[in-house]
Amino acid sequence: MERPGATTLKGNPLTLIGPELKAGDKAPDFNLVDNSLKNVTLADTGNNVRILSVVPSLDTPVCDAQTKRFNEEAAKLPGVDILSVSMDLPFAQKRWCGAFGVDNVKMLSDHRDGSFGSHYGTLIKELRIESRAIFVLDRSNTVRHAEYVKEVAEHPNYDAALSAARTAASAASA
């Protein structure tokens, strides 16, 4: 499934591959690679509420800021795990995390086949990188919040994602 014009980069329309997930959808499985080159599926991410922070590349200013922001917020979110997904190679993700002291966010790479992007609707066809997006998954792997940032160079709505994660974590502990 292709979604022409679903996102832009500096105003230029781009095509996203895959469905547009919405709150209430079941989260699709994925096969990503962590910094130790281990395969990671949705089931491997545990039973906590999860924020999936999807970025084009850690080596860009907005992606850098987005990942650092979620790293800071992680300590204030009991019962919530934060996963950052990009097409960056695992070696580059590990280097970047070490350089900036990012250790509260689990870095995952979709570089092998882009299957995360095609299942979550974030793969930019023309560039073969991820678009900027945020998903909040509850403990039963239901999407509780989904944001596809229209302009790739802009920040997501952090407050909306954090609020959705807190709400899902509160519901899980009740």
What are these regions (language model features)?
Residues 1-174:
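Chalcogenol-based redox active-site neighborhoods
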